[in-house]
Amino acid sequence: MAIHLYKTSTPSTRNGAVDSQVKSNPRNNLIYGQHRCGKGRNARGIITARHRGGGHKRLYRKIDFRRNAKDIYGRIVTIEYDPNRNAYICLIHYGDGEKRYILHPRGAIIGDTIVSGTEVPIKMGNALPLTDMPLGTAIHNIEITLGKGGQLARAAGAVAKLIAKEGKSATIKLPSGEVRLISKNCSATVGQVGNVGVNQKSLGRAGSKCWLGKRPVVRGVVMNPVDHPHGGGEGRAPIGRKKPATPWGYPALGRRTRKRKKYSETLILRRRSK
């Protein structure tokens, strides 16, 4: 990813750093409108997810997470920006005339060919079942349920690793550090998701953040006591507690939020590390 730095004529351009190569030119038959209802609110209009709201209107790009065009070679025609995710997407022209979007694998360029199936080369961008992959393969866009499409390791720069195969299950290590079991018949895509340097971008100003639909984040220590447990005091005061707390009074550090008795509890061999 090429980071473009502007001439320092204003504070926003002095501090901004954006990608200068990838543009957005979506195909009309692969996009459709979406109604972004709520934006962090529930049916009563109450804020349930803070720091969300506003943002530019978006058109949803239909992404092929299933990769079910078996044994049909496709060619990467364009690499485009997608406002609905931090990873880039590729437009694929298949040999039978069909056109689809997929997640952009790291290192893939325009003109590369990809294919999905059971006996395909272990090559970046190819999709195949876990049972046909050698141990140690770097993968992304991993299925949890057979035929449902990839659900894991889809963010920019995400990569998982196939570390074991035993019986009907395969063991993979996810980007979060979690180690879990998945059916060997589920498919995944070889390689790492592109746009690895997304965290190197600097928006440079608050307005660019608002375009993304992200509202300002205010520290609890500068709020009033009615708004946050850290609030109150004369001038710059400490939080007044032994440990930090959330706006609702729960411990902010170390409290587990995962639901108990979840169906996947027996499939997780090691919980994610922070």
Curated annotation (Swiss-Prot):
Positions of the UniProt region annotated as Disordered: 1-25, 224-274
GO molecular function, one term: transferase activity
InterPro entries the record matches: NA-bd_OB-fold, Rib_uL2_dom2, Ribosomal_uL2, Ribosomal_uL2_bac/org-type, Ribosomal_uL2_C, Ribosomal_uL2_CS, Ribosomal_uL2_dom3, Ribosomal_uL2_RNA-bd_dom
Pfam families referenced in this protein's UniProt entry, alphabetically: Ribosomal_L2 (PF00181), Ribosomal_L2_C (PF03947)
Keywords: Chloroplast, Plastid, Ribonucleoprotein, Ribosomal protein
Compartment list: Plastid, Chloroplast
Entry's Gene Ontology BP terms: mitochondrial translation
Top-level taxon of origin: Eukaryota
Record-linked PROSITE patterns: RIBOSOMAL_L2 (PS00467)
Any one of the GO CC terms: chloroplast
Subunit structure: Part of the 50S ribosomal subunit.
Membership in a protein family: Belongs to the universal ribosomal protein uL2 family.
Protein's name according to its UniProt entry: Large ribosomal subunit protein uL2cz/uL2cy
Annotated organism of origin: Aethionema cordifolium (Lebanon stonecress)
Gene transcribed to yield this protein: rpl2-A
